[in-house]
Amino acid sequence: ELALVSGFTDNRPLVSVVSEALARSAKHKLIGYSGMSGSLGKSNWRVLSPTFEAKEAQDSNDASLVLAFRFDGYNLLTLGDLGEDGQRRLMRSSFPWLVQLRKAPLVLKVAHHGSKDQSVELHSLIQPDIALISVGAQNDYGHPTRSLLSMLQGLGTSTLRTDIHGAISLRIEDDRLVAATGGKLSM
């Protein structure tokens, strides 16, 4: 098994605990960096951000691994916890890749549980067809924010949220993307 991690130096105690657990469970731990690519099953992936040491990052959220996946006529962009500044930086450093993602239906894993720290410009550029928001029910942070949900609605993006729909899985069936939520098929 392979674990891909950010090269950002983070000295918080919980990071050490997670790193130790990862060392016990993963056969290989690699630092993901912009330009790194590979395959996973039928999909191809590419790291769009950060750089190897993530020196451009202000904090661990800003150093989130951003990956683009291409599979069976669909694309997936995962933003981790990347905030608005990082999303703008991503647009500058990976603009051609982001434009390419629009050539097929795009699924977006929304950054940071749908916090308000989002780039309208990035979302307008990529115009995701489906947005996945991983967020706890009745969380104290107010995630996802109304501004994010309004932005996605304005872009015509279908939204799936773990706080409403439970566990979410996607699969391709007869060249269509099918979502299963909470154990039941939808979309």
Model feature map: region roles:
Residues 1-187:
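Non-globular, low-confidence helical/coil segments that flank catalytic cores
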